[in-house]
C-alpha cells in the first residue's frame, strides 16, 4: 500500500458557452459529495485522507490524498465516483470529461 496524492481534472467541452458553466460552488459541492463516502472511512475501496477541489472557469482540479495499492487504481476509483456524480446532473455537466493529472507517491511499503 502507498500514501499518494492523485490529481484529476474535470473539463467542460471547449466550445461550451462560458455563461452556461455551473457555478463554482455547485461544481465543488457536487464533486466533493462524490468523494465524501471514501473520506475518513478506512474500510472503503480507497481511503481518502483529504481532498481539495478547485473549480476554475468551466473546469475543476481534484486532488486527493489517499491510501491505495497504486496511483492507477486510486485514479480509477476516484474518477468513477466523479463520473457518476456528473452523470447524475447532466444539466450541469453535459459533455464534461475527466483527465488524469500527476500522481505523487509520498510513502510506499513495496
Which role does the model predict for each range below?
Residues 1-60, 68-80, 84-110:
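Long, contiguous binding/interaction regions
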Amino acid at each position: 500500500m502507498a500514501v499518494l496524492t492523485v490529481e484529476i481534472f474535470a473539463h467542460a467541452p471547449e466550445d461550451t458557452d462560458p455563461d452556461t458553466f455551473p457555478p463554482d460552488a455547485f461544481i465543488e459541492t457536487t464533486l466533493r459529495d462524490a468523494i465524501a463516502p471514501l473520506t475518513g472511512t478506512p474500510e472503503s475501496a480507497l481511503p481518502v485522507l483529504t481532498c481539495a477541489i478547485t473549480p476554475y472557469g468551466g473546469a475543476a482540479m481534484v486532488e486527493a490524498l489517499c491510501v491505495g495499492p497504486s496511483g492507477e487504481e486510486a485514479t480509477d476509483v476516484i474518477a468513477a465516483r466523479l463520473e457518476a456524480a456528473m452523470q447524475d446532473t447532466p444539466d450541469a455537466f453535459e459533455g464534461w470529461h475527466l483527465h488524469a493529472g500527476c500522481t505523487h507517491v509520498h510513502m510506499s511499503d513495496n
